[in-house]
Regions:
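Conserved alpha-helical scaffold segments that buttress catalytic/binding sites
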Residues: 1-138
Length: 138
């Protein structure tokens, strides 16, 4: 990643990324991308972490949210995603994060990705969980 490209990443924020490769870790570190880890948010408090995010995004005109369902705890919800990893967020926590960001009035899009019903050992539970999140925030 070149220095000129890192300016575009200053407002990129991750929540709950838990399964990365060393190359990804290097980019996250070198570009100073904040990853709010699940245990960090639970320890520090969701409100505190979300307020930090809102402060960081004050100069941003538009916010685009990608909700990758593998941020959800696969043991609590489902393995119906490309990268099922335990110790993730529960549905209520994801809703809290998205609603907090929505409170800015700057969210222009919400993308939901990584649902894979072929890997879902609970029927179509991961898709149902995604719909629960969407239903709760709109």
């Amino acid at each position: 990643v070149q220095a000129s490209e890192t300016d575009d990443l200053k407002t990129l924020i991750y929540f709950g990324v838990r399964d990365t490769e060393s190359q990804e870790d290097d980019i996250i570190e070198s570009c100073k991308i904040k990853n709010y880890r699940v245990h960090e948010m639970r320890h520090r408090g969701f409100e505190v972490c979300i307020q930090e995010v809102l402060t960081k995004l004050t100069e941003v005109d538009m916010i685009y949210i990608t909700f990758d369902v593998d941020a959800l705890d696969c043991d609590l919800v489902s393995y119906g995603t490309g990268t099922p990893v335990s110790k993730g967020f529960d549905i209520e926590e994801v809703v809290m994060i998205i609603k907090g960001i929505q409170s800015t009035g700057k969210v222009v899009a919400l993308e939901v990705c990584e649902i894979n019903p072929l890997l879902d050992h609970k029927g179509n539970r991961m898709a149902e969980a995604a719909f629960e999140v969407i239903d709760s925030i709109f």
